[in-house]
Amino acid sequence: KFYDNEVDNYSQDHYQLHWNQRYNNNWSTTIGLNYTNGRGYFEQYKEDEDFADYGLEALDFNGEVVNTTDLIRRRWLDNDFYVVNATANYKDANIDLIFGGSFSHYDGDHFGEIIWAEFASQSQIRDRYYDGNSLKNDLSVFSKANYKLNDKVSLYGDLQVRNVTYKTFGNTSDLVDFEVNKDFTFFNPKA
């Protein structure tokens, strides 16, 4: 069956601020800020869908059990993403030294709605038949040094510590419950 409003309606807004400052011949700094807001859905007409796939109860319709329906659903994504980056740089004839850090935070909601059904069971318009949230934090600090021993030989070192945290909870579009709470820390040396 043709449905004339099967759409993918998603948009993002991006906001950025960049700042670079040179203090003298040796010192400089940078800061970058970013915010992205994304939201939208795709809409579909589905025929003969099982009530159980949407967490709905069967209906008794004039003595006949009805447990399927034609419906229109929307599957949503609504998220926010924040990033901060900062560095400080010292440079002279023999050494190039950079210190910095980065932090990002993602918060995403994923959910589904039935916006119309031939047989609605106990469902109301805009009820969520699945609903999940995901959070991710990523923090990193680093330092890099390049030391010139002479015109042909340099020493290089890079140290990074990174922490990533994932937290998710809710249920999937298949109505499977999930919960994740993981934290990872890494130390990444390079020479």
Regions found by a protein language model. Name each.
Residues 2-8:
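A conserved mid-domain beta-alpha-beta active-site/ligand-binding segment of alpha/beta enzyme cores
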